């Protein structure tokens, strides 16, 4: 309802702060243009609780990315204050933030996802790894410190960089098309095919504006149905709610591999979730409205 007070949470202190600021501004501008009583709050620093208690919002649109918005702390705070919000629960956010935990759950339920394990100093010193592999922080987003590694020499450098952001995982490299699907509760949107500027969809490819996006993705009807069903099943298995996005690799044999689930996807002009919705005929303002109206 438009007479409800809405706070858009953005910014924060994670490495994805700048992206979050852009997402938050886009969402806030959209809400205000549609007549909502909305204000933005930068979640940086230690004043968030005080700000929320002062503003007393009915709902929060969570446009935080990385640790600040996706590790469960903000969800826990909002749930404690009994404020409806657009992201997943604390428990689900903790799970989806940690790519290894997510993978273990998906593999337990025989969902298609590349094999992975934690990367340690000892493993870096071994030469039994079958290259190429992906090396990335176990927790994090926007493909920050994510590398395609083709040799033991590259592995050492990738490990050093990724370990700056916490525990590091090494993952089987799967070659194929990068596909993503946005979900808002029971609404599963069209798949989007990303042709990255670089060899894979890394940080530069995501935010340079030079990657090519196909929405809809061009999958045949059968494969489109399959990827949507896989996305929704992964979303449900990890206990997601509200707005989330599921990323895949689609190989040349027609197999989909679930790469990760993002519980607080970007909402910038260049972000994938709005493209997924647009392929269904849902423009940005309508998409924002659907997300906030379904806040839980």
Swiss-Prot record:
Species of origin: Francisella tularensis subsp. tularensis (strain WY96-3418)
Cofactor(s) annotated in UniProt: Mg(2+); Mn(2+)
Gene name tied to this protein: ddl
Family under the similarity heading: Belongs to the D-alanine--D-alanine ligase family.
Pathway the protein acts in: Cell wall biogenesis; peptidoglycan biosynthesis
Key words of the record: ATP-binding, Cell shape, Cell wall biogenesis/degradation, Cytoplasm, Ligase, Magnesium, Manganese, Metal-binding, Nucleotide-binding, Peptidoglycan synthesis
Classification via SUPFAM superfamilies: Glutathione synthetase ATP-binding domain-like, PreATP-grasp domain
Pfam families listed in its UniProt record: Dala_Dala_lig_C
GO MF annotation list: ATP binding; D-alanine-D-alanine ligase activity; metal ion binding
Protein name as it appears in the record: D-alanine--D-alanine ligase
PANTHER family: D-ALANINE--D-ALANINE LIGASE (PTHR23132), D-ALANINE--D-ALANINE LIGASE B (PTHR23132:SF23)
Bound cofactor: record note: Binds 2 magnesium or manganese ions per subunit.
Binding locations of Mg(2+) 2: 260, 262
